[in-house]
A protein has these predicted regions:
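Short, basic (Lys/Arg/His-rich) helix/loop patches that form interaction surfaces
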Residues: 106, 110, 166-177, 187, ...
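Conserved tyrosine-mediated DNA breakage-rejoining catalytic core shared by Y-recombinases
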Residues: 143, 197-255, 262
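Short, polar N-cap/turn motifs at the start of nucleic acid-interacting alpha helices
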Residues: 201-208, 324-344
Length: 364
């Protein structure tokens, strides 16, 4: 144990006769405090960035499968980076910024960097809360450091939707996907909800779709059933006449395997792959990609990148443009916050603005 002393308590105190002048005790206390705040507690500060993130993730129990996948994605990136080997006590604010800039220079997209920081920042905050660090070096606005070059997923126009669906329907190679893709455009289902649908979820008699779960596949190729994030994700969607016809065809043409695959007590999945397993989101991402690529090779007027999630955007946008009540649309989309429905999934283009202005002016 070390001690400090001074012949003066405060700076303005009188120095005793014969004693050498020195800093007052309160001044020395302030210096010591500043030095302690600048230093780091060694036992915690010696662990590496990778070890810190692993510890943080180990405490996140009971998270959804998508979240686990995201954690593993971030871990794999950090494992490949020299930054992951650094002791957390050596990481300063400028180091954190330079690392994220490096990730973008290496070709990582803004959304990937956003995901990485979304895990690393709370991990470092955990170190602060545990008194391993005094400051969180990742506590800054991401947009001030890296350029947001992400491409916003927009809803496609009705003309593009018709062209895409017509191409699929007339294609000898892709027409087997027509009914499913039509349903995605006309119901706004999440792809994980769609692939999770079973025969028991489709009520053809009353023309209803029961949505109360999602089908996911883990990194180790296990199939899992997950409930929606919130109670709003559980809903019953009415079928239009066209959607009813599509579902009826899908069920009539569905193969009957000798052994129905079962996932967490559910069986009778509408779509199976060549191995007899339920299709998952990745399958449909590939189908959409192949169709778009094929279309754009044939036609001069190119289609944008269309994905299952673009179908969901498009459904929401079309319903909003048609004047659907916002609360009804929120229910159909399964959103807990109507702000998500209105601000994220509703896309207004110039043609829509022009049409709406003409409608209002003519009504006067």
């Amino acid at each position: 144990m070390q001690f400090v002393y001074s012949w003066k308590l405060e700076k303005g105190d009188r120095l005793p006769a014969g004693k050498r002048d020195d800093l007052a005790l309160r001044e020395k206390e302030r210096e010591i405090k500043q030095r302690l705040e600048a230093e780091l507690i060694p036992q915690g500060g010696e662990i590496t960035v990778l070890e810190l993130v692993k510890k943080y993730i180990s405490l996140k129990t009971g998270v959804r499968q998508n979240t686990k996948t995201g954690y593993n994605f971030v871990l794999n990136i950090i494992k490949k980076e020299e930054f992951g080997k650094r002791q957390i006590s050596s990481v300063r604010l400028s180091d954190a910024k330079l690392w994220l800039i490096k990730l973008q220079s290496d070709g990582r997209g803004y959304s990937t960097i956003h995901t990485v920081r979304g895990v690393v920042r709370p991990a470092f905050q955990m170190a602060v809360d545990d008194d391993w660090l005094h400051k969180n070096p990742f506590e800054f606005q991401l947009a001030t450091v890296v350029v947001n070059d992400s491409v916003k997923r927009e809803a496609i126009t009705r003309k593009q939707e018709r062209a895409f669906l017509n191409y699929i329907r007339e294609s000898g190679c892709y027409k087997k996907y027509y009914d499913a893709i039509y349903i995605l455009f006309k119901t706004g289902l999440r792809i994980s909800e769609f692939v999770g649908l079973t025969l028991a979820d489709i009520d053809l008699e009353h023309r209803k779709i029961n949505v109360d779960h999602q089908l996911q596949r883990t990194m180790d190729m296990r199939y899992v059933i997950e409930e929606p994030k919130t109670s709003c994700g559980k809903r019953v969607i009415p079928m239009t006449d066209d959607v009813y016809v599509c579902f009826r065809r899908i069920i009539e043409n569905r193969p009957r395997p000798k052994n129905e695959p079962m996932v967490d007590g559910k069986c009778g999945f509408l779509f199976l792959d060549q191995n007899g397993n339920p299709t998952v989101a990745m399958h449909w991402e590939h189908y959409f990609n192949h169709i778009c690529t094929s279309y754009n090779k044939l036609y001069r007027e190119q289609l944008p990148n269309i994905t299952p999630h673009v179908c969901r955007h498009t459904f929401c946008s079309n319903m909003a443009k048609s004047g659907m009540n916002p609360k009804t649309l929120q229910y159909l989309m399964g959103h807990s916050d109507i702000g998500v429905t209105l601000n994220i999934y509703t896309h207004v283009q110039y043609d829509d603005v022009e049409t709406e202005m003409k409608r209002v002016v003519n009504a006067e």
